Amino acid sequence: MNENLFASFITPMMFGLPLVTLIVLFPSLLFPTSNRLVNNRLISLQQWMLQLVSKQMMSIHNTKGQTWALMLMSLILFIGSTNLLGLLPHSFTPTTQLSMNLGMAIPLWGGAVITGFRNKTKASLAHFLPQGTPTPLIPMLVIIETISLFIQPVALAVRLTANITAGHLLIHLIGGATLALMSINTTTALITFIILILLTVLEFAVAMIQAYVFTLLVSLYLHDNT
């Protein structure tokens, strides 16, 4: 009970399994095509998942934006897999670190913005000044739009960090309460254990949803600049 609540987020704490092997094998999910005439269930599930996600992500993009399809698919698989691996006992979740999430958000956001300035320079600059703005408000609106542009990657990273960290802390707190109540009140301990199971199931869903939200927002930033 004296363990620090943030101990599971310390980088040196790793699950005692060769997770590097799993990480290296994750890109194979992007190439589910088999030489067999009839695919097995795993390959069929991979194809269905990739087609569904790519349809949701890339349907709004033009030809130039669709060149980012493989990168966005890699991104959602990477974030989703790291979030799910972080739910294993005594494992470390990289996406609870703001530095890592900023390291993903800033280059992707920057790439989308640079693409917009290269392909649609006038349209990108026009975003800083909405049409019909009164002359006295022009300097203020330009500053506000500039701040809102540069805060996008920060909001993207903070959203992912906060959601993953909050779920892990809740699981840690309720798990500790369950252990403490086992010797005091068995009925209450059983109730908290059921809540813990439900919260764990919810955290699995949150892990995938946050990967989808992160990638979808990057896709929307790209759509605004292509």
Swiss-Prot record:
Recorded GO CC terms: mitochondrial inner membrane; proton-transporting ATP synthase complex
Lineage: Eukaryota, Metazoa, Chordata, Craniata, Vertebrata
Family per similarity comment: Belongs to the ATPase A chain family.
Keyword field: ATP synthesis, CF(0), Hydrogen ion transport, Ion transport, Membrane, Mitochondrion, Mitochondrion inner membrane, Transmembrane, Transmembrane helix, Transport
Entries under SUPFAM superfamilies matching the protein: F1F0 ATP synthase subunit A (SSF81336)
Molecular functions per Gene Ontology: proton channel activity; proton-transporting ATP synthase activity, rotational mechanism
Cited Pfam families: ATP-synt_A
Membrane-topology annotation of the record: Multi-pass membrane protein
Stored NCBIfam families: ATP_synt_6_or_A (TIGR01131)
Complexes and interactors: Component of the ATP synthase complex composed at least of ATP5F1A/subunit alpha, ATP5F1B/subunit beta, ATP5MC1/subunit c (homooctomer), MT-ATP6/subunit a, MT-ATP8/subunit 8, ATP5ME/subunit e, ATP5MF/subunit f, ATP5MG/subunit g, ATP5MK/subunit k, ATP5MJ/subunit j, ATP5F1C/subunit gamma, ATP5F1D/subunit delta, ATP5F1E/subunit epsilon, ATP5PF/subunit F6, ATP5PB/subunit b, ATP5PD/subunit d, ATP5PO/subunit OSCP.
A biological process from GO: proton motive force-driven ATP synthesis
Cellular localisation: Mitochondrion inner membrane
CDD domains assigned: ATP-synt_Fo_a_6 (cd00310)
Keyword rRNA-binding attached: no
Annotated function: Subunit a, of the mitochondrial membrane ATP synthase complex (F(1)F(0) ATP synthase or Complex V) that produces ATP from ADP in the presence of a proton gradient across the membrane which is generated by electron transport complexes of the respiratory chain. ATP synthase complex consist of a soluble F(1) head domain - the catalytic core - and a membrane F(1) domain - the membrane proton channel. These two domains are linked by a central stalk rotating inside the F(1) region and a stationary peripheral stalk.
Protein name: ATP synthase F(0) complex subunit a
